[in-house]
Amino acid sequence: MAESINSFDSKSTLQVGEKSYDYFALDAVPGMEKLPYSLKVLGENLLRNEDGKNITREHIEAIANWDPSAEPNFEIQFTPARVIMQDFTGVACIVDLATIRDAVVALGGDADDVNPLNPAEMVIDHSVIIEAFGDSDALEKNVEIEYQRNDERYKFLRWGTGAFENFRVVPPGTGIVHQVNIEYLARSVFDNNGLAYPDTCVGTDSHTTMENGLGILGWGVGGIEAEAAMLGQPISMLIPRVVGFKLTGEIPTGVTATDVVLTITDMLRQHGVVGKFVEFYGKGVGELPLANRATIGNMSPEFGSTAAMFPIDEETVKYLELTGRDQETLERVEAYAKAQGMWLDPEKEVEYSEYLELDLSTVVPSIAGPKRPQDRIELNDSKAQFRKDLHNYVEADASAVTPDFDAEGPATENTSAQTAGTPASAADAKGNIPSAAAGAEGRPSNPVTVNYNGEDIELDHGMVAIASITSCTNTSNPSVMVGAGLLARNAAAKGLKSAPWVKTSMAPGSQVVNGYYEKAGLWKDLEAMGFYLVGYGCTTCIGNSGPLPEEISAGINEGDLAATAVLSGNRNFEGRINPDVKMNYLASPILVIAYAIAGTMDFDFETQPLGQDQDGNDVFLKDIWPSTEDIEEVIASSITKDLYAEDYANVFEGDERWRSLDVPSGKTFDWDPKSTYIRKAPYFDGMSKEPEAVNDVKGARVLALLGDSVTTDHISPASTIKPGTPAAQYLDANGVERKDYNSLGARRGNHEVMVRGTFANIRLQNQLLDGVSGGYTRDFTQEGGPQSFIYDAAMNYQKENTPLVVLGGKEYGTGSSRDWAAKGTLLLGVKAVIAESFERIHRSNLIGMGVVPLQFPEGESWKSLGIEGTETFDIEGIEELNNGSTPKTVKVTATKENGEKIEFDAVTRIDTPGEADYYRNGGILQFVLRNMMSGK
């Protein structure tokens, strides 16, 4: 760490017990004391890294004099203390760093000059896929398959730990990066050779914001931005607006942390917080356990905010103590936070840019779906809302709507509590077989009978095909995890079980969960419901749900059924969870089990029983719902500091499989030209020491014409590779058998696979084509512009030197911090993306890869302008960047085949001078490499 020039003379000494620390005192700068917590962290960051060049006295004064009402317009340079990665994005990062070493050597430099300057830590959590489930061997089977599939990748990462300084890897089978981060990796307040400063951390996963619950400022960035941060490049940003979110009251009985976070997500999405910090304050904050704060922080990308901060307080220190941090750390965190005015004072209200308020006592049980996290549904309305939404997923003539009718004849023994004509449960027998079509009156229904596990069962629209307790969002939270275990216990005691067509799974975010489940004796109850341990990793939440049983999959496809998934995750975008599933719902772990028992989303927990007990009595959800007292009692008796200490004692060592990997050595990597997993990246091929001039775009064609809320999943899916697609064709040509395709996410170290998988999501709707889903476009290099794979068309355009553009709607690039969504866009030959609005990370990633993001004029869209996608595009004004200034707008001309022109001024979304530098250099990594070679 370079020495600060300390122009405010702010360096001071903090005495904590017998130990003293240097620190940069905020009170040396007038105005810092009145700032929100998150801006105080930024202020300290600038004080400590002031170098008189990138960070000057003017930058520090700009933070201190922050105007809450102003729109962001002042650029600062944020220097994170560390970087975390997951393996899907992380492998690509290490491939890029290894490639940069090669480029440095080729330009006459030393490979040793390329190293992370601050801690860079990776947790391998994205590679485990749920192949096996429903039995006690599932974990071992899935781990074994994971190692077989990922041998090359894991050897490469082991090489990286030996080749690079400051780089460590948490091996597979340990947990999920964000949960491991808050439970172990997070420092809260650093002690760097006697210098104390706040832990700040960016990560190559958008849910890095989980650490915000611990008072750590950070957020998800693209892999390319993370690589630059590792190499010492500060992150360019505008001083943001800060939304104050006041919490009052207490969470009522029967309401979970998941319900709270879905409510907050709904509120903040409606309010609009893209590009802003959200900061929680008020007396209600003190009532929230740290795990609940982490759950809320985790969902920041779903709100759209950059960060969702909770200041440090007693609850923070209690959590650090529970998770095994030493006494010196606890004392340092508390003393530092109090000395810097960063300790939460519930009575004090600072000035924010905007305000929202939630009385926690008003929160009700909720789920979200069927395709966005912000689509919150109150549980009482879930059946009615499902029936409304179902019509969007079922062809009008593909399924008959079963008419409503009153049952005739006398009531049978177990129908007393039911609506007339409605079975006790969707999993009840219909025609003496378990049926997901039970109670289908009034909605589309298309029953399909299959034989599974020796039993005839009936599938239908709304069937819960997947019920998965997954994701760090919820598995880090003991209240909902213990609650799920107790609900399973109560259900088992009543003789209930999951519907036979449901693929059930339990994938905790750390081994600590296994520890307290064992201690509380809850595993046998969870397993009775089918929820066996399948792995420690992201699994279903990122689309690694694994295949459905063949019979179930065949039945769903035969009937073109709108099957559903219920998961305790953070994202439910279309096409993300499983290719056989059309509708995805987020729910608490407790409700995941409840829906597994119900077997269908077409279910009203208030009026419909889940089944009958041994005496034939109806059992409703309320009858098995665990009490708050029971949950707290299990937590108090089962979760101890020793559990965390034991599970994290040897966190970097791994199992015998990891330790026995045959690891290559050397400062530079010996690339295998036959590898289909790890290939040298092409971004520096032919790169000169000086950047070339940027050019206007002339004669471009539209590669994709897209609507609103196109996610980075749509652009660069992480899902399994579909046979027959360009990515599969490449693997076939390289001798890879279909069973070994693995997922696109697992192959992010190979650009040849990834460029072929760009815009290849099976749910992508390219509106250049009518009624076609998937990675297709029209290829205007051929007569009549026939339908073609997007990759094939892009390669034809490249042969003719025709540049490409992509047109989008609102919230383009929402979702994961997936740098391959930008890398793949570049490698396809796209020069510009024009959309109505961009999500923060993807906009930044596009610039970081040398693709210009442009925005339609306010209130306009490609549709309103009359653009059809068959036009050729010219973009004038980009060349102004060569003169050192960024044009506010550029002129776009779309010329139709008949010569008619559509002209408009698009807003240039290169928002800071730093981003302009990246774009002029062809990308952020080229900028960093050129600076490295010139000694800057």
From Swiss-Prot:
Role of this protein: Involved in the catabolism of short chain fatty acids (SCFA) via the tricarboxylic acid (TCA)(acetyl degradation route) and probably via the 2-methylcitrate cycle I (propionate degradation route). Catalyzes the reversible isomerization of citrate to isocitrate via cis-aconitate. Could catalyze the hydration of 2-methyl-cis-aconitate to yield (2R,3S)-2-methylisocitrate. The apo form of AcnA functions as a RNA-binding regulatory protein.
UniProt pathway annotation: Carbohydrate metabolism; tricarboxylic acid cycle; isocitrate from oxaloacetate: step 2/2; Organic acid metabolism; propanoate degradation
GO molecular function: 2-methylisocitrate dehydratase activity; 4 iron, 4 sulfur cluster binding; aconitate hydratase activity; metal ion binding; mRNA 3'-UTR binding; mRNA binding
Oligomeric and partner information: Monomer.
Composition skew (Polar residues), residue ranges: 412-422
Keyword presence, Iron: yes
Annotated catalysed reactions: citrate = D-threo-isocitrate; (2S,3R)-3-hydroxybutane-1,2,3-tricarboxylate = 2-methyl-cis-aconitate + H2O
Binding site for [4Fe-4S] cluster: C472, C538, C541
The name this protein goes by in its record: Aconitate hydratase A
Organism of provenance: Corynebacterium jeikeium (strain K411)
UniProt cofactor note: Binds 1 [4Fe-4S] cluster per subunit.
